[in-house]
Amino acid sequence: MKGNFKKSLSIFGALSFAFTAGFLLSNVNVYAATNQTLELNKDYYFDLNGDGQAEKIKYTTQVNKDDNDFFNSVSLFINDKNVYTKKLTDTWAKYTVLDIDSSDNTLELNLQIGGYSDVMDYSSFQRWNGASIVEFDNNKNKALNYTREYSFSNVKGNGRFNIVVDTPYSLPIGCFYANIPLKLQNNKITTTTGTYNLVGSSKKYKYKAKGNIKVYKKASKKSKVKFTVKKGDKIKMIKIKPM
């Protein structure tokens, strides 16, 4: 355990041994939503490309004929025309409409596709240019490369936003939710800080140390020990810093 803590995370301590270590729109809505997850097979109306005209938007899945629990592809329709299809055999998919940067007069679309236990196999960010869908970023990007479904928060149209991710990094503590701040600039999404807050009940969990744990000032072999958590001490994880 000491090696894992030292090599992968830098966790900050406090006296209490607390480590400083997702509104539904109507069917017709011509106004831009900043953070709207769409329902499958339901029509919505958004001005996606800032031309003053609302596009009719809907996404569907094509059910696997051999197993109704799975689909073989996800398709996006704009003004009743199939403009995008992702072929992937999975169990769930969702589209979210976002206005990440209101200064560009366009809306962003986020697609996530995955399987059981909210495991995510593909995600991408897209825009409608009036003629076709353009995918400008996806989960090959390290800042978006997570294995489970995420939701959006703090979308204010200034280019910055947060995603809340289920267990973005493997830790001995098991599952947890972390808030990851991101920004969109020049069609690229990047993280804005290296330290991520745990959210909801995740930051309230208490863990009991099974043995002494050395906590280092930095995730480095040359780092000095900040303090030692003693066997039996109770710990809360509040922040994480992946390296």
Q: Residue locations for each model-derived region?
A:
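Acidic carboxylate motifs that coordinate Ca2+ or other divalent cations, activating on Asp/Glu
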Residues: 51
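Low-complexity, acidic Ser/Thr/Pro-rich repeat tracts that form intrinsically disordered stalk/linker regions
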Residues: 28-40
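Calcium-binding motifs, dominated by EF-hand helix-loop-helix domains
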Residues: 44-48
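Blade-edge motifs of beta-propeller repeat domains
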Residues: 33-36, 80-92, 137-139, 225
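Sec-dependent N-terminal signal peptides of Gram-positive bacterial secreted proteins and lipoproteins
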Residues: 1-31
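Short aromatic loop motif centered on NTY/YTY
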Residues: 92-202
